[in-house]
C-alpha cells in the first residue's frame, strides 16, 4: 500500500491531499453483506442507497439486501499529516535548518517541499484551515478558541457544512485518527462534560488520543482517549513518562492494530505533538542529545545567515532573496 506523509508547521508550511475521483465500482455480489463499493464523492455525505431487496408478507418470499460497504479506491495511500507548534519555516534540516530531521529529509527527497502555503500567526486558525481546506474565518476560527467572540467567523465552531479531511476520508472508507493537540474545541465544550460534537470524534476522526487546548504539561497532561480522561502517567517516577513518547507509541499501536485486522484499509492520521509549544518539557535523553550537537553556539545572527544560505542552496527560497536586517 502506498504511503503519503505530509508535514506542516503552525507558523510555516501547510499541505493538503487530493485523491483522484473515480466512478462508483461495486465489488462482490450486490446486496450481499460482503459487497463493497467506491463512490465518486461528488456529494458529501454520500446519500444512503435505496433498499434493493424484496419485502413480502412472508419472510420466505422476501429477499434481504445490504447496502455495499464504502471502501476507498484501489491503492489509496495511507496518509500521515504532522503539524507542529511554534517551529519556524527554517527549523528542520528538510528546509535548510540545523535541527537534523533525517527521516523527513528522506521523504522530501522522494516527494515535494511546499513553501507557499497560507498560514496565520495564530494556532487555532491555522489548524482550522488545515483540517477543513478553507479560509480560517469560514471555519469559525478568526482567533484562537479562548478569544472567540460569538460573531460569524469568530465563534470557534466548525459548522456541519465545513467537513474536515477526517470526515471526508472517513466517509470514503478510511480509518481516521487524531493524536496530540486539539486547539479547535470551543472553550465551553473543553471539559469532560462536553458537548463532544466539536471534538475530533465529532469531526470525522474515529479515534482520538491527546489533549484539548493550546498547551499541555508533557509530564502530566490533561489527556483524553476519545472523550474519556486517562491518567497513564500515574505511578511513574518523575521524568519517566512523557507525552511525546507515549503519543508516538499509541499511534504505532493504532496503525498496527488496523493493519493486522484489515490490511487493505488505508489510514489517515493527524499527528499534532504539542511539545514545541511552552511549557517545554523535553526528556533528559533529548536534552543531552541536542546539547551535544552545539547547534546554537554561534548565536542567532550567524545561525540565521547559515539557514538562509542553506535554503538558497536547496532552492527553497529564490536566489535573489535578501535577508531582512
What are these regions (language model features)?
Residues 16, 32, 201-204:
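A generic structural signal for short, non-catalytic loop/turn and secondary-structure boundary residues
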Residues 9-10, 35-37:
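Compositionally biased regions
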Residues 23-30:
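Cleaved targeting-peptide boundary
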Residues 7, 28, 281:
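Alpha-helical and His/Cys-centered functional microenvironments
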Residues 30-33, 276:
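Long, non-globular segments of proteins
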Residues 2-21:
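Gram-negative bacterial Sec-dependent N-terminal signal peptides
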Residues 37, 42-325:
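Formylglycine-dependent sulfatase
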Amino acid at each position: 500500500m502506498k504511503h503519503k506523509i505530509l508535514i506542516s508547521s503552525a507558523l510555516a508550511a501547510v499541505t493538503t491531499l487530493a485523491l483522484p475521483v473515480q466512478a462508483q465500482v461495486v465489488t462482490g455480489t450486490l446486496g450481499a453483506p460482503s459487497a463493497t463499493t467506491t463512490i465518486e464523492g461528488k456529494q458529501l455525505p454520500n446519500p444512503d442507497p435505496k433498499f434493493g431487496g424484496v419485502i413480502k408478507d412472508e419472510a420466505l418470499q422476501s429477499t434481504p439486501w445490504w447496502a455495499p460497504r464504502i471502501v476507498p479506491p484501489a491503492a489509496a495511500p495511507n496518509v500521515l499529516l504532522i503539524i507542529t507548534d511554534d517551529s519556524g519555516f527554517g527549523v528542520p534540516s528538510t528546509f535548510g535548518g540545523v535541527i537534523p530531521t533525517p527521516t523527513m529529509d528522506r521523504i522530501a527527497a522522494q516527494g515535494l517541499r511546499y513553501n507557499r502555503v497560507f498560514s496565520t500567526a495564530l494556532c487555532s486558525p491555522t489548524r482550522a484551515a488545515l483540517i477543513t481546506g478553507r479560509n480560517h474565518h469560514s471555519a469559525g476560527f478568526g482567533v484562537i478558541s479562548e478569544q472567540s467572540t460569538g460573531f460569524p467567523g469568530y465563534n470557534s465552531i466548525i459548522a456541519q457544512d465545513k467537513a474536515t479531511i477526517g470526515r471526508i476520508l472517513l466517509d470514503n472508507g478510511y480509518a481516521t485518527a487524531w493524536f496530540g493537540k486539539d486547539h479547535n474545541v470551543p472553550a465551553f465544550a473543553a471539559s469532560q462534560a462536553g458537548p463532544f460534537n466539536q471534538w475530533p470524534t465529532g469531526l470525522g476522526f474515529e479515534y482520538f488520543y491527546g489533549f484539548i487546548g493550546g498547551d499541555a504539561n508533557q509530564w502530566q497532561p490533561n489527556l483524553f482517549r476519545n472523550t474519556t480522561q486517562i491518567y497513564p502517567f500515574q505511578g511513574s517516577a518523575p521524568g519517566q513518562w512523557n507525552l511525546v513518547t507515549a503519543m508516538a507509541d499509541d499511534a504505532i499501536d493504532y496503525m498496527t492494530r488496523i493493519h493486522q485486522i484489515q490490511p487493505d484499509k488505508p489510514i489517515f492520521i493527524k499527528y499534532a505533538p504539542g511539545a514545541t509549544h511552552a511549557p517545554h518539557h523535553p526528556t533528559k535523553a533529548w536534552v543531552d542529545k541536542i546539547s551535544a550537537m552545539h547547534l546554537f553556539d554561534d548565536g542567532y545572527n550567524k545561525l540565521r545567515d547559515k539557514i538562509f544560505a542553506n535554503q538558497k542552496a536547496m532552492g527553497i527560497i529564490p536566489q535573489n532573496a535578501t535577508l531582512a536586517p
